[in-house]
Amino acid sequence: MKPILLQGHERSITQIKYNREGDLLFTVAKDPIVNVWYSVNGERLGTYMGHTGAVWCVDADWDTKHVLTGSADNSCRLWDCETGKQLALLKTNSAVRTCGFDFGGNIIMFSTDKQMGYQCFVSFFDLRDPSQIDNNEPYMKIPCNDSKITSAVWGPLGECIIAGHESGELNQYSAKSGEVLVNVKEHSRQINDIQLSRDMTMFVTASKDNTAKLFDSTTLEHQKTFRTERPVNSAALSPNYDHVVLGGGQEAMDVTTTSTRIGKFEARFFHLAFEEEFGRVKGHFGPINSVAFHPDGKSYSSGGEDGYVRIHYFDPQYFEFEFEA
């Protein structure tokens, strides 16, 4: 399995994301550049220039018309996907940690960090109302007083958002009223990543407590646990197999004191039902910060602390592989 290597960032990758069809791959890093690539051959299509700090999150809407990015320069920006033109600039008081379009692409949400004396907020904007964008006034703002949000996604049908916190808590906030619908605490440490399944019925969380866990999207009922010996930075569900891929590794500050072999910087594949590991893919030098499955399930990508993104197309053996219970 020879990967395609994407070199478009000078700093550590923070998030990678495919669009719905999977023909484009968006990558953001701890530099101000937002890149978009053809996923089939790794050719760089273009960049979205404008941010002045590390970019923490990226999302594309349903029909890949708009791209949304959130950055440590205290702004969330909306871009025209095709032309790279900046359509909106939403200023915040602290860094934007997570962002996302709802199912219809009309409503955006983003969460800000708890820093510099400012509270962590989740803001909701309706793109159909230009006055909200012009006046930088969201139609709803949810304060998070206890522990800041470290990852968030829209729930099924855009009725709620699912948010993971620094404390390991998982919340479901209503997108209509802003109230907390469900609250669970299955992780003991920070939740680094949340990714939904293709049909949005379940999602996987990746946590600093060395586990990834599977939950039901509507009830937040905990279903499966995937254990490793290292903090898990990202986890993604296969769209057509019962497989989950985990990416992680040591904290950046511990990395220099160990060899890469001890660091365990592989992408690890687990069976969804049996919670058993069945494969690993080496390659990155340093921890893996973000993983994503292609929507057709025939390839996956990973972005690492080394600043590289690798696109892996699965070998035929992967598709013939039968897991023996």
Curated annotation (Swiss-Prot):
- Subunit comment for this entry? Component of the eukaryotic translation initiation factor 3 (eIF-3) complex, which is composed of 13 subunits: EIF3A, EIF3B, EIF3C, EIF3D, EIF3E, EIF3F, EIF3G, EIF3H, EIF3I, EIF3J, EIF3K, EIF3L and EIF3M. The eIF-3 complex appears to include 3 stable modules: module A is composed of EIF3A, EIF3B, EIF3G and EIF3I; module B is composed of EIF3F, EIF3H, and EIF3M; and module C is composed of EIF3C, EIF3D, EIF3E, EIF3K and EIF3L. EIF3C of module C binds EIF3B of module A and EIF3H of module B, thereby linking the three modules. EIF3J is a labile subunit that binds to the eIF-3 complex via EIF3B.
What is the gene name?
EIF3I
State the InterPro entries in the record.
Answer: eIF3i, WD40/YVTN_repeat-like_dom_sf, WD40_repeat_CS, WD40_repeat_dom_sf, WD40_rpt
GO annotation (BP), single: cytoplasmic translational initiation
Q: Name one Pfam family in it.
A: EIF3I
> Known HAMAP family for this protein?
eIF3i
The UniProt record lists the keyword Phosphoprotein? yes
Name of this protein:
Eukaryotic translation initiation factor 3 subunit I
To which species is this protein native? Homo sapiens
WD repeat ranges are 1-39, 43-81, 87-127, 135-175, 180-217, 221-267, 275-316
Find the cross-link Glycyl lysine isopeptide (Lys-Gly) (interchain with G-Cter in ubiquitin): 282
Q: Identify residues that carry Phosphothreonine.
A: 219
Localization recorded for this chain is: Cytoplasm
Q: How is it modified after translation?
A: Phosphorylated by TGF-beta type II receptor.
- Please indicate if the UniProt record lists Lipid metabolism as a keyword: no
